[in-house]
Amino acid sequence: RFGESFWGFLPRTVLGSLRSAWHLEKTRLNRQGRSPWTLRNDVLNAWAMSVVLFAALGLAFGPGILAYLFLQAVFGFCLLEVVNYIEHYGLLRQRTASGRYERCAPRHSWNSDNVTSNVLLYHLQRHSDHHANPTRRYQALRHFEGIPEMPTGYAGMIVLAYFPPLWRRIMDRRVLAHYGDDIALVNIHPAKRSAVLTRHGAAA
């Protein structure tokens, strides 16, 4: 969301993902006539496996390793979510005349064709093609002209995202340029919407 820092996005997406995962599993199990409180629940199953893994490593290497396991887990999901943040910042699928959102297309996510990062990250930065064609193998992901383009590879973008003033200075103008300076087309953070529209001379 335009105007939302990564540090504001992080708790929202982590908690939202937990709620969404639980709701989806509860709905799936209810259709089968089952309670969500079962190991057939993939959410509980994953949590249980994590507890078993941490306990086994704690027994093998001593309780001191638990702090390292906790830190790597936090680092892991923070890395996942900062990538999520940089891949979609400010972009919005518009509603069609039918009231439905338009089909997902390469223009709905940020792309990078940085050679070094693409080699190291298995073309992760060609996210636009994956976004529009999720079944395409990573080796065949393509770069498109005229789609939102990151100014650098993922390593540089992740560092920028950790410093919101730098991020906004570089990325806000790129979001606006992608939409032809039409702020009404941008995915704006609701808490900042009025201030953003006023700053850009648009009606709230």
Can you describe what each PLM-predicted range is?
Residues 37-61:
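A conserved active-site cap/scaffold subdomain adjacent to cofactor or substrate pockets
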Residues 1-43, 64, 75-204:
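Cytosolic/stromal cytosol-facing helical appendages immediately following the last transmembrane segment
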Residues 62-71:
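Hydrophobic alpha-helical transmembrane segments
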